[in-house]
């Protein structure tokens, strides 16, 4: 472990390897490279101090270096204890960007690193947050509430909350008033994923959001591409790398049929699995049925299926009573943001056998075993390397544009949650067409007038559902 300088990575000697993979990824990320070309000279993020909490992968390295090329100072940590690619972290650290991320880091270290990404060498404060899941944002807001005298740290509901609250208390003792100062310095946050967006909307509805936020997740070029097509490729990759199990002919259950569930079902179906879906939402359930999937109750298939994947963003989707009834060597994994979709805490008193990193065999009293991937955390990042570079280019181009928007136009946004305007969503899509050899049909003036749009777009209303 390297800790001499302003970074913490597993092995700084991996930097050259990471740099080679970053170079390859850049050729697959036309949106980010176009941002560098368009905005590099103007440096619209000059003066921005961005705290980033997002999976420290090769693709994220390209995002980080894009933000730096646009003038920002950046400090970075991963938003998941298993998702870091150590060679990517090393390459970014070697390039001079403070990064604090190790694949397989402890929860204690995770929250220490989250604190470190707010601790600038000159004692200054962050003025922007780029978040994935909302942990960096919540860290500051919880600490500020504690400083205001609210009793928010007394009753943790999980092991992770115990560790988070302990870290907040350490910072409160070391730097009284710091959380409030840091909160007040933030110009805005851009949020990557469904779970973090839900947190922001809850804060906004209660009048507790202290700065503007852009919901990057619900940009069409994020949710309909990263969430769907990204999962379509990376889910099966993670299961294969973790288990070497052949999926053709197996029965797989996908819990949830939102965008992530749709991509996951397609991923497993494409690998030859016989896919069944569970859903609480009647609209999503109808979509699943009309896409050809049997929509079932988990209780009715728990003893017969081979693979179980959670995609919901909710908690306790697969519970201990479900896992007790699973067949021997059933595979259980999650591709939603947090680890509480599967009731992993209830498994801790059983016999665990670690097979290899992020693959555990858990034995129940009656003798049946399950294969748990990434301890219930994101298996596509824990057991594999996440989504491909091309689809992440679309997501991260949205992040870059959102950071520019909030940082350069602070007076135009209230303390609410916003979505990037349609013309920027279409711009992100355009930036990725040439790479695929796509040719767009040009509307005539008459055609455009007939449907009430400009020949140059936007081509759809804000309420259009893609």
Curated annotation (Swiss-Prot):
Protein known as: Adenosylhomocysteinase
Free-text comment on the cofactor: Binds 1 NAD(+) per subunit.
Function statement: May play a key role in the regulation of the intracellular concentration of adenosylhomocysteine.
Substrates-to-products reaction catalysed: S-adenosyl-L-homocysteine + H2O = L-homocysteine + adenosine
Annotated source species: Rhizobium etli (strain CIAT 652)
PANTHER family: ADENOSYLHOMOCYSTEINASE
GO biological process: L-homocysteine biosynthetic process; one-carbon metabolic process; S-adenosylmethionine cycle
Keyword NAD tagged: yes
Pathway the protein contributes to: Amino-acid biosynthesis; L-homocysteine biosynthesis; L-homocysteine from S-adenosyl-L-homocysteine: step 1/1
InterPro entries cross-referenced by the UniProt entry: Adenosylhomocyst_ase-like_sf (IPR042172), Adenosylhomocysteinase-like (IPR000043), Ado_hCys_hydrolase_NAD-bd (IPR015878), NAD(P)-bd_dom_sf (IPR036291), S-Ado-L-homoCys_hydrolase_CS (IPR020082)
């Amino acid at each position: 472990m390297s800790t001499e300088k302003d970074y913490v990575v597993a092995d700084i000697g991996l930097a050259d390897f990471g740099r080679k993979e970053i170079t390859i990824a850049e050729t697959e990320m036309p949106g980010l490279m176009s941002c560098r070309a368009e905005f590099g000279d103007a440096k619209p993020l000059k003066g921005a101090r961005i705290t980033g909490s997002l999976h420290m992968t090769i693709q994220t390295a390209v995002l980080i270096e894009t933000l730096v090329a646009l003038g920002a100072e950046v400090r970075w940590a991963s938003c998941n204890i298993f998702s870091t690619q150590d060679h990517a972290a090393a390459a970014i650290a070697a390039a001079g960007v403070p990064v604090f991320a190790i694949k397989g880091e402890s929860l204690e270290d995770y929250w220490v690193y989250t604190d470190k990404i707010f601790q600038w060498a000159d004692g200054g404060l962050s003025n922007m947050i780029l978040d994935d899941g909302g942990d960096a944002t919540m860290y500051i807001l919880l600490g500020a509430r504690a400083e205001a005298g609210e009793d928010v740290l007394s009753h943790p509901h999980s092991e992770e909350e115990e560790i988070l609250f302990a870290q907040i208390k350490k910072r409160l003792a070391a730097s009284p008033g710091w959380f409030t100062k840091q909160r007040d310095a933030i110009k805005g946050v851009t949020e990557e994923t469904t779970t973090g967006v839900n947190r922001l909307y809850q804060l906004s509805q209660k009048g507790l959001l202290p700065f503007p936020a852009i919901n990057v997740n619900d940009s069409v070029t994020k949710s309909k591409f990263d969430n769907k097509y990204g999962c379509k490729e990376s889910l099966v990759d993670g299961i294969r790398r973790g288990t070497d199990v052949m999926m053709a002919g197996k029965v797989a259950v996908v819990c949830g049929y939102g965008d992530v569930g749709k991509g996951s079902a397609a991923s497993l179906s494409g690998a030859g699995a016989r896919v069944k879906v569970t859903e609480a939402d009647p609209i999503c359930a109808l979509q699943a049925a009309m896409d050809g999937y049997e929509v079932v109750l988990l209780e009715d298939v728990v003893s017969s299926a081979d693979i179980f994947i959670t995609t919901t963003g909710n908690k306790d989707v697969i519970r201990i009573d479900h896992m007790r009834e699973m067949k021997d060597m059933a595979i259980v994994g999650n591709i939603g943001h947090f680890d509480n979709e599967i009731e992993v805490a209830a498994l801790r008193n059983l016999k665990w056998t670690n097979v290899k990193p992020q693959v555990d065999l858990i034995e129940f009293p009656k003798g049946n075993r399950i294969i748990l991937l990434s301890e219930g955390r994101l298996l596509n990042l824990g057991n594999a390397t996440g989504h491909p570079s091309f689809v992440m280019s679309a997501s991260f181009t949205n992040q870059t544009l959102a950071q520019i928007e909030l940082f350069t136009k602070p007076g135009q946004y209230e303390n609410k949650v916003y979505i990037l305007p349609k013309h920027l969503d279409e711009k992100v899509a355009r930036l990725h067409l040439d790479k695929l050899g796509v040719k767009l049909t040009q509307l005539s003036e008459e055609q455009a007038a007939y449907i009430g749009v400009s020949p140059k777009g936007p081509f759809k209303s804000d309420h259009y559902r893609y």
